[in-house]
Amino acid sequence: MKNFQIYLSTAPVLAAVWFTVLAGILIELNRFFPDALSFPLT
């Protein structure tokens, strides 16, 4: 189990998880606000 935790804390694994989460957020934003180049605050 300790080796698995060390594996999960390596930079490539963390980067893959982070980019997957970021892509999901961007896909959902694009689904609710299509073709939004900027988000009006008012």
Swiss-Prot record:
UniProt GO BP: photosynthesis
Range of residues in the leader sequence: none
InterPro entries with a match to the protein in the record: PSI_PsaJ, PSI_PsaJ_sf
GO cellular component, one term: chloroplast thylakoid membrane
Pfam family, one: PSI_PsaJ
Cellular compartment(s): Plastid, Chloroplast thylakoid membrane
Bilayer topology: Single-pass membrane protein
Bilayer-crossing regions: 7-27
Highest taxon of source: Eukaryota
Keywords tagged on the record: Chloroplast, Membrane, Photosynthesis, Photosystem I, Plastid, Thylakoid, Transmembrane, Transmembrane helix
Major localisation: plastid
HAMAP family associated with the record: PSI_PsaJ
Role played: May help in the organization of the PsaE and PsaF subunits.
The family this protein is said to belong to: Belongs to the PsaJ family.
Alphabetical list of PANTHER family matching this protein: PHOTOSYSTEM I REACTION CENTER SUBUNIT IX, PTHR36082
Protein name per UniProt: Photosystem I reaction center subunit IX
Organism from which the protein derives: Ostreococcus tauri
Upper lineage: Eukaryota, Viridiplantae, Chlorophyta, Mamiellophyceae, Mamiellales
Gene from which this protein is expressed: psaJ
